[in-house]
Amino acid sequence: MLSGKVLPDAVLAYTTSGELSPNKDNVVLLPTFYTGSHIRNEGFFGAERAIDPARHFIISVNMFGNGFSTSPSNAADSVRGSHFPDISLYDNVFCQHRLLTEKLGIERIRLVAGWSMAGCQAYHWAAQFPEMVETILPFCASARTSPHNFVFLEGVKAALTADQSWNE
């Protein structure tokens, strides 16, 4: 990971819809957003829609920390709970790249799309692997997080860590 820490036995949960074309040129990647999962991504595609399983091979990858992929609640004991390492969007995209290339044999992505933090991952895909990504469609996302958002998230974090059993 970017931090230099290791996430032992890391698992990226994902689902697919549609069929991969013989040329492997119909891949649409839908990362998940903060608090989202592959289930929430199902609303972004469907029959006769812009993203259609009849035409596209859709891969929906769950972010680390969302409960489906390796998360503070299901990680190895050494990194469970409050010991869970900081994971960046870079780390998520790097591991997604390994999933697509090493496990699924994909070399090209037609579209990476997503909203909020999934859109931020679309930006990262284009920056980290520009030769692999044809198009990105980030919406309600920014390429850089504003200072205001950091302050907002500190408030959320403070509410969680104020719990007496936070470190248990």
Task: Describe these PLM feature segments.
Residues 1-168:
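Ligand-binding pocket scaffold of soluble enzyme catalytic domains
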